[in-house]
Amino acid sequence: MKTAIIQLPGLNRDRDMVAALHHITGVEPLKIWQTESTIPDVDVIVIPGGFSYGDYLRCGAIGARTPVLQAVREKAQKGVTVIGICNGFQILLEAGLLPGTLMRNTSLKFVCREIKLEVVNVNTKFSRYYSKGQIICCPVAHHDGNYFVDSETLKQMEENEQIIFRYAENTNPNGSVNDIAGIINKAGNILGMMPHPENFIEPAHGGTDGRLFFQSALELAKG
Protein backbone atom coordinates (compact mmCIF):
# COMPACT_ATOMS: atom_id res chain seq x y z
CA MET A 1 0.00 0.00 0.00
CA LYS A 2 1.55 3.27 -1.15
CA THR A 3 0.12 6.62 -0.08
CA ALA A 4 1.13 10.21 -0.78
CA ILE A 5 0.39 13.46 1.03
CA ILE A 6 0.35 16.73 -0.88
CA GLN A 7 2.24 19.55 0.86
CA LEU A 8 1.49 23.21 0.16
CA PRO A 9 2.54 26.33 2.09
CA GLY A 10 0.03 26.85 4.90
CA LEU A 11 -1.28 23.29 5.12
CA ASN A 12 -0.81 22.38 8.78
CA ARG A 13 -2.62 19.08 9.24
CA ASP A 14 -0.15 16.99 7.29
CA ARG A 15 1.51 15.53 10.39
CA ASP A 16 -1.85 14.36 11.69
CA MET A 17 -2.49 12.72 8.33
CA VAL A 18 0.95 11.10 8.27
CA ALA A 19 0.25 9.58 11.70
CA ALA A 20 -3.17 8.30 10.61
CA LEU A 21 -1.93 6.73 7.38
CA HIS A 22 1.06 5.16 9.10
CA HIS A 23 -1.20 3.80 11.84
CA ILE A 24 -3.41 2.03 9.29
CA THR A 25 -0.84 0.91 6.72
CA GLY A 26 2.34 0.61 8.77
CA VAL A 27 4.11 2.46 5.95
CA GLU A 28 5.29 6.08 5.96
CA PRO A 29 3.48 8.05 3.23
CA LEU A 30 5.36 9.92 0.53
CA LYS A 31 5.36 13.71 0.83
CA ILE A 32 4.86 15.56 -2.44
CA TRP A 33 5.74 19.28 -2.56
CA GLN A 34 3.76 21.93 -4.44
CA THR A 35 6.26 22.35 -7.27
CA GLU A 36 6.28 18.69 -8.29
CA SER A 37 4.67 18.09 -11.68
CA THR A 38 4.56 14.31 -11.37
CA ILE A 39 3.53 11.91 -8.63
CA PRO A 40 5.03 8.41 -8.29
CA ASP A 41 2.78 5.37 -8.56
CA VAL A 42 0.68 5.33 -5.40
CA ASP A 43 -2.67 3.87 -4.36
CA VAL A 44 -4.03 6.88 -2.47
CA ILE A 45 -3.32 10.63 -2.59
CA VAL A 46 -4.39 12.84 0.33
CA ILE A 47 -4.64 16.63 0.47
CA PRO A 48 -4.77 17.53 4.18
CA GLY A 49 -6.28 20.48 5.99
CA GLY A 50 -4.91 23.87 6.92
CA PHE A 51 -4.79 27.27 5.27
CA SER A 52 -2.92 26.85 1.99
CA TYR A 53 -1.36 30.12 0.86
CA GLY A 54 -3.08 31.88 3.76
CA ASP A 55 -6.50 31.37 2.14
CA TYR A 56 -5.81 34.39 -0.07
CA LEU A 57 -8.28 35.05 -2.91
CA ARG A 58 -10.50 32.16 -1.74
CA CYS A 59 -9.87 29.10 0.36
CA GLY A 60 -8.03 26.63 -1.87
CA ALA A 61 -7.98 28.92 -4.92
CA ILE A 62 -4.19 29.21 -5.19
CA GLY A 63 -3.52 25.64 -4.12
CA ALA A 64 -5.78 24.38 -6.90
CA ARG A 65 -3.54 26.08 -9.47
CA THR A 66 -0.20 24.61 -8.44
CA PRO A 67 1.80 22.16 -10.58
CA VAL A 68 1.21 19.34 -8.11
CA LEU A 69 -2.57 19.70 -8.40
CA GLN A 70 -2.34 19.15 -12.13
CA ALA A 71 -0.47 15.95 -11.31
CA VAL A 72 -3.24 15.02 -8.85
CA ARG A 73 -5.81 15.64 -11.58
CA GLU A 74 -3.97 13.31 -13.96
CA LYS A 75 -3.78 10.56 -11.33
CA ALA A 76 -7.46 10.98 -10.47
CA GLN A 77 -8.43 10.65 -14.14
CA LYS A 78 -6.62 7.30 -14.14
CA GLY A 79 -8.71 6.11 -11.19
CA VAL A 80 -6.29 6.71 -8.31
CA THR A 81 -8.06 7.35 -5.00
CA VAL A 82 -7.91 11.01 -3.94
CA ILE A 83 -8.98 12.32 -0.53
CA GLY A 84 -9.32 16.00 0.39
CA ILE A 85 -9.93 16.91 4.04
CA CYS A 86 -11.04 20.43 5.06
CA ASN A 87 -8.75 22.75 3.06
CA GLY A 88 -8.04 19.74 0.87
CA PHE A 89 -11.78 19.59 0.13
CA GLN A 90 -11.76 23.29 -0.71
CA ILE A 91 -8.84 22.73 -3.10
CA LEU A 92 -10.62 19.85 -4.87
CA LEU A 93 -13.68 22.05 -5.36
CA GLU A 94 -11.60 24.93 -6.71
CA ALA A 95 -9.88 22.50 -9.06
CA GLY A 96 -13.24 21.34 -10.40
CA LEU A 97 -12.64 17.76 -9.30
CA LEU A 98 -15.80 17.83 -7.17
CA PRO A 99 -19.06 19.77 -7.64
CA GLY A 100 -20.11 22.76 -5.57
CA THR A 101 -18.34 25.34 -3.45
CA LEU A 102 -17.61 26.13 0.19
CA MET A 103 -18.64 29.48 1.63
CA ARG A 104 -18.18 31.29 4.93
CA ASN A 105 -19.90 29.59 7.90
CA THR A 106 -23.34 31.07 8.50
CA SER A 107 -22.21 32.05 12.01
CA LEU A 108 -19.34 34.04 10.42
CA LYS A 109 -17.11 32.43 13.04
CA PHE A 110 -14.36 29.83 13.05
CA VAL A 111 -15.85 26.60 14.40
CA CYS A 112 -13.72 24.04 16.25
CA ARG A 113 -15.59 21.24 18.02
CA GLU A 114 -16.75 17.65 17.79
CA ILE A 115 -19.84 17.01 15.71
CA LYS A 116 -22.02 14.04 14.78
CA LEU A 117 -22.10 12.59 11.27
CA GLU A 118 -24.59 10.22 9.67
CA VAL A 119 -23.15 7.70 7.23
CA VAL A 120 -25.55 8.06 4.31
CA ASN A 121 -23.99 5.80 1.68
CA VAL A 122 -21.93 2.71 2.52
CA ASN A 123 -21.53 1.52 -1.07
CA THR A 124 -18.29 3.45 -1.57
CA LYS A 125 -14.61 2.75 -1.08
CA PHE A 126 -14.57 5.35 1.70
CA SER A 127 -17.47 4.09 3.81
CA ARG A 128 -17.91 0.36 3.22
CA TYR A 129 -16.89 -0.58 6.78
CA TYR A 130 -19.57 1.60 8.34
CA SER A 131 -23.26 0.73 8.63
CA LYS A 132 -25.87 2.71 6.71
CA GLY A 133 -27.37 5.30 9.03
CA GLN A 134 -24.57 4.89 11.57
CA ILE A 135 -23.90 7.98 13.67
CA ILE A 136 -20.22 8.70 14.18
CA CYS A 137 -18.31 11.44 15.96
CA CYS A 138 -15.70 13.58 14.23
CA PRO A 139 -14.03 16.95 14.91
CA VAL A 140 -14.29 20.00 12.65
CA ALA A 141 -12.10 23.11 12.54
CA HIS A 142 -12.93 25.61 9.81
CA HIS A 143 -14.17 29.08 8.93
CA ASP A 144 -15.39 28.37 5.41
CA GLY A 145 -17.17 25.02 5.49
CA ASN A 146 -20.63 26.00 4.31
CA TYR A 147 -21.15 23.65 1.35
CA PHE A 148 -23.39 24.95 -1.42
CA VAL A 149 -24.43 23.63 -4.80
CA ASP A 150 -27.27 24.62 -7.14
CA SER A 151 -30.54 22.72 -6.84
CA GLU A 152 -30.21 20.84 -10.13
CA THR A 153 -26.70 19.61 -9.34
CA LEU A 154 -27.81 18.70 -5.83
CA LYS A 155 -30.64 16.60 -7.27
CA GLN A 156 -28.18 14.79 -9.53
CA MET A 157 -25.81 14.19 -6.63
CA GLU A 158 -28.61 12.72 -4.54
CA GLU A 159 -29.67 10.45 -7.41
CA ASN A 160 -26.07 9.36 -8.00
CA GLU A 161 -25.56 8.71 -4.27
CA GLN A 162 -22.59 11.06 -4.20
CA ILE A 163 -23.32 12.24 -0.67
CA ILE A 164 -21.59 10.03 1.89
CA PHE A 165 -21.74 11.98 5.16
CA ARG A 166 -24.28 14.41 6.58
CA TYR A 167 -24.14 16.42 9.78
CA ALA A 168 -26.49 14.69 12.21
CA GLU A 169 -28.47 15.42 15.35
CA ASN A 170 -28.62 19.18 14.72
CA THR A 171 -24.83 19.54 14.79
CA ASN A 172 -24.44 21.23 11.37
CA PRO A 173 -21.65 23.69 12.24
CA ASN A 174 -21.65 25.81 9.10
CA GLY A 175 -25.04 25.89 7.37
CA SER A 176 -24.19 23.43 4.58
CA VAL A 177 -27.10 22.70 2.24
CA ASN A 178 -28.91 19.48 3.17
CA ASP A 179 -26.43 19.05 6.05
CA ILE A 180 -23.81 17.81 3.57
CA ALA A 181 -20.45 17.02 5.19
CA GLY A 182 -18.74 14.74 2.65
CA ILE A 183 -19.17 13.95 -1.04
CA ILE A 184 -17.62 11.92 -3.86
CA ASN A 185 -17.35 12.39 -7.62
CA LYS A 186 -19.44 10.37 -10.06
CA ALA A 187 -16.64 7.86 -10.62
CA GLY A 188 -16.37 7.28 -6.87
CA ASN A 189 -12.60 7.66 -6.54
CA ILE A 190 -12.44 11.26 -5.26
CA LEU A 191 -13.76 12.29 -1.84
CA GLY A 192 -13.94 15.65 -0.11
CA MET A 193 -15.15 16.30 3.43
CA MET A 194 -14.83 19.07 6.01
CA PRO A 195 -14.59 16.95 9.21
CA HIS A 196 -11.22 15.49 10.24
CA PRO A 197 -11.38 11.66 10.52
CA GLU A 198 -7.58 11.57 10.91
CA ASN A 199 -7.97 13.06 14.38
CA PHE A 200 -10.16 10.22 15.63
CA ILE A 201 -7.95 7.19 15.04
CA GLU A 202 -6.84 6.25 18.55
CA PRO A 203 -8.75 6.25 21.87
CA ALA A 204 -6.21 8.61 23.42
CA HIS A 205 -7.29 11.26 20.92
CA GLY A 206 -10.92 11.12 22.02
CA GLY A 207 -12.42 8.58 19.63
CA THR A 208 -11.81 5.99 16.94
CA ASP A 209 -14.67 6.63 14.51
CA GLY A 210 -12.24 7.85 11.85
CA ARG A 211 -10.39 4.55 11.76
CA LEU A 212 -13.02 2.79 9.64
CA PHE A 213 -12.87 5.59 7.09
CA PHE A 214 -9.19 4.99 6.43
CA GLN A 215 -9.49 1.23 6.62
CA SER A 216 -12.24 1.37 4.00
CA ALA A 217 -10.33 3.62 1.62
CA LEU A 218 -6.86 2.16 2.05
CA GLU A 219 -7.68 -1.53 2.06
CA LEU A 220 -9.99 -1.27 -0.95
CA ALA A 221 -7.41 0.77 -2.85
CA LYS A 222 -4.85 -1.93 -2.13
CA GLY A 223 -7.23 -4.63 -3.30
UniProtKB/Swiss-Prot annotation:
Pathway: Purine metabolism; IMP biosynthesis via de novo pathway; 5-amino-1-(5-phospho-D-ribosyl)imidazole from N(2)-formyl-N(1)-(5-phospho-D-ribosyl)glycinamide: step 1/2
Record-linked SUPFAM superfamilies: Class I glutamine amidotransferase-like (SSF52317)
Xref: InterPro entries: Class_I_gatase-like (IPR029062), PRibForGlyAmidine_synth_PurQ (IPR010075)
EC numbers: 6.3.5.3, 3.5.1.2
Primary location group: cytoplasm
SMART domains (alphabetical): GATase_5
Record-annotated Glutamine amidotransferase type-1 domain positions: 2-223
Superkingdom of source: Bacteria
Keyword annotations: ATP-binding, Cytoplasm, Glutamine amidotransferase, Hydrolase, Ligase, Nucleotide-binding, Purine biosynthesis
Active site: 86 (nucleophile), 196, 198
Catalytic activity: N(2)-formyl-N(1)-(5-phospho-beta-D-ribosyl)glycinamide + L-glutamine + ATP + H2O = 2-formamido-N(1)-(5-O-phospho-beta-D-ribosyl)acetamidine + L-glutamate + ADP + phosphate + H(+); L-glutamine + H2O = L-glutamate + NH4(+)
Protein location: Cytoplasm
BP-aspect Gene Ontology terms: 'de novo' IMP biosynthetic process
GO molecular function, one term: ATP binding
CC per GO annotation: cytoplasm
Its biological purpose: Part of the phosphoribosylformylglycinamidine synthase complex involved in the purines biosynthetic pathway. Catalyzes the ATP-dependent conversion of formylglycinamide ribonucleotide (FGAR) and glutamine to yield formylglycinamidine ribonucleotide (FGAM) and glutamate. The FGAM synthase complex is composed of three subunits. PurQ produces an ammonia molecule by converting glutamine to glutamate. PurL transfers the ammonia molecule to FGAR to form FGAM in an ATP-dependent manner.
Record text on subunit structure and interactions: Part of the FGAM synthase complex composed of 1 PurL, 1 PurQ and 2 PurS subunits.
PANTHER family documented for this protein: PHOSPHORIBOSYLFORMYLGLYCINAMIDINE SYNTHASE SUBUNIT PURQ (PTHR47552:SF1)
Name of protein: Phosphoribosylformylglycinamidine synthase subunit PurQ
UniProt gene name: purQ
